[in-house]
Amino acid sequence: ANQSNSRSHEKSNMVHFFDFNQERLAAWVIEHGMPRHTTDQILDWVYRKGVSDPAQMTNLSRGQRTYLAEHIAFTRGRTVAHQSASDGTQKLLVSWADGAHPTETTGALPIVGQSNVARGQETECVLIPAESRRTACISSQLGCPVGCKFCASGIGGLEGNLTAGQIIEQVFQLGQLKGVDRISHVVFMGMGEPLANYAAVTDAIRTLNAPWGFGISARRITLSTVGLPVAIRKFCDFEIPVTLALSLHAPNDAIKSLENYFIDFIYILFYCFWGTA
């Protein structure tokens, strides 16, 4: 047990690989005495070949592989439960035992502050197969600040924001499941309100879409939101034109406002269709 705790502590002090983008990884590689092209080799192993163990990165020198293993945590999430359905859907319960770094929020909801995922807390992600598609349904927060009555995620309120790396790692872990060749689509429809964790979510989308990352086209990435007007307006200027889905789960505004939603939907819809013009 002591050895396990020691390894966990060591890993928590290492930089998380999925928090790197191409530029930051290149800077880290050069700073640590490796040639620039090592960046492309590492990215190819992780995103093209699905390899997260430096020991298997055979086109790197033995010294480089050892150094990477000692200084970079290629994965931080630990799967504590794995459920499968008869239709091929698979759900992972992932524990972020190493904790998370604070992430900034948009300020669109006053109750959302700078928060972090506490040690040992968990999020869910789901693989949804359909013919040739392999869709990753991922979480952006631990809990949710909105508190829609139809959704269990918000029962305990918001406990923390996930980092960009933790969001990206969910896609990687789902891609490691048996029989999954590659993830073709991503939907932000898991735990949390994505636009309330704007900086981390948009950073994650950049990696999901980038040619050096997962290379998933923008039209295959969907962000679902209850509708945060300030964040929606900002998101309209985001450089990657992903699909924005408004979460509508009631037939009229009275039910939405009074029974389900903490946010006034009429204002949201007006803002979406006229305020962004």
Where are these regions (language model features)?
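Short hydrophobic targeting helices and cationic amphipathic motifs
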Residues: 3-6, 269
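Flexible, acidic/Gly-rich N-terminal and inter-domain linker regions that tether
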Residues: 5-133
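Accessory RNA-recognition modules of RNA-modification enzymes
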Residues: 54, 179, 256-257
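Conserved Radical SAM active-site core
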Residues: 121-242, 252-253, 274-276
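Short glycine-enriched, charge-decorated loop/helix-capping segments at active-site entrances
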Residues: 155-157, 258-263
